[in-house]
Amino acid sequence: MTSTWRTRLAGVLAWTIALALFFPIAWAALTAFKTEQDAYTPTLLFTPTLDSFREVLERAHYPSFLGNSLAVSAISTLLALAIAIPAGYAMAFFPNRRTQQVLLWMLSTKMMPAVGVLLPVYLLAKTAWLLDSITALVIVYTLANLPIAVWMVFTYCNDVPREIFEAARMDGANLWQELVYVLLPTMLPGLASTALLLLILSWNEAFWSLNLTSIDAAPLTVFIASYSNPEGLFWAKLSAASVLAIAPILVLGWLAQRQLVRGLTFGAVK
């Protein structure tokens, strides 16, 4: 009986947490179909309208904001993976007494508030003439996501059976061939989940984009923030813009859900 009640309590707790996390998204989706008047004085009884979506999509430079988000997120994700894969491979298969210290130091950088390094990063970007450029965002996003990427790749590398590499060496494979032809195919599900996580982090990032860009390189997060200005807070349009920004990630996650689940459980059962 005790075990049954624990199971039920865990189920209720899980559903409560899930609903609490889903509620803001559901509320934003609901608000997106309201007029500004209905959104400002929240009501559940309203006539749905697509006016907010229409105004957001027809707003000047929207395709540019969308293109910037796609470019910055994709490029920074690929760069972070390109650096993290050999780094994680080297730390997992050729560790030394400082490997764990390096990993902990990299992880500790994620605990530093971004505002603490805003001024030096801004001055560096200004000196290098990179303000309001995609290059600046790509560099910052790549460096910001690199610790997570290295940690995840390092973990996946440790979960790969060493016997596979011993067999490859017996067949005459060198280090490069082990990495490309043995390790990468084996940990592909893990890399897929890592790539999706990095893409989501880059897509959702707002702090650096708001401080390092204005118009030319501004992503969708800046576009969404523009609906909160001195003239007021336009809840319906802000919600519509947020829903449109969330949609690509939801679709991508749905399409890659099989790889994502396999990646999250990679190495759980050997």
Put a short name on every predicted segment.
Residues 1-270:
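A hydrophobic, multi-pass inner-membrane permease signature
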